[in-house]
Amino acid sequence: MRLEQKKVAVSVPKIFLEDRWDHVNGASHNSQLFRVTLDTFEPIGRKQASLQNHNGIHNRMTFVVGDRVEQEALASIISRRADPGTGNVGFENYALERSDHHLSKAVLVGADPQRNVYFTLGENGVPDTVVSCWIAGKVPFPGCDQYFRASGMDIKVNYRAYAFQNWQKIQEDITRFLSCAVEASKNKDI
């Protein structure tokens, strides 16, 4: 992970890795993409995802494991992107209101907000989780992006907006998966 200048070793079953270059033992990557079902966390390949799209089935998420800027800077970037025309407003300048699903919602002040932005805050007031969802009617198929850290890595998750209410389960499933992947790498010679 380039920004933090560190590596996190993981070991996952090959079925989760689509690309041949990901199957090389000891390979080092700056990021890794996974695609799984929302309900059972089973891996889904590109062909299967394409077929599901064709049939109107969207019960899946993708997540990228990598390295990004600090969560507070990320929260500011996501908020500004959702609230165009507000200039260089930082996360700390947005008022937060209570929202459903144990989240706080940013009160966007721009003339035409594009997304709703939600947060969970850590003890120090810095966002632990950022969830950004398209506002219905702004795009044909609204989705959500969710950002958090797990096992020393930054995670970006993407799923359809209907799954937003399950954001905690999604985060717990990914956290458990990555925790197992890190632990498995300690038990192997990588």
How should these model regions be labeled?
Residues 1-95:
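Charge-rich, low-complexity N-terminal segments
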Residues 6-8, 127, 153:
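Short acidic/polar mixed-charge low-complexity motifs
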Residues 90-140:
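Signature of long, low-cysteine stretches enriched in small and polar/charged residues
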Residues 135-190:
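Long, compositionally biased interface segments
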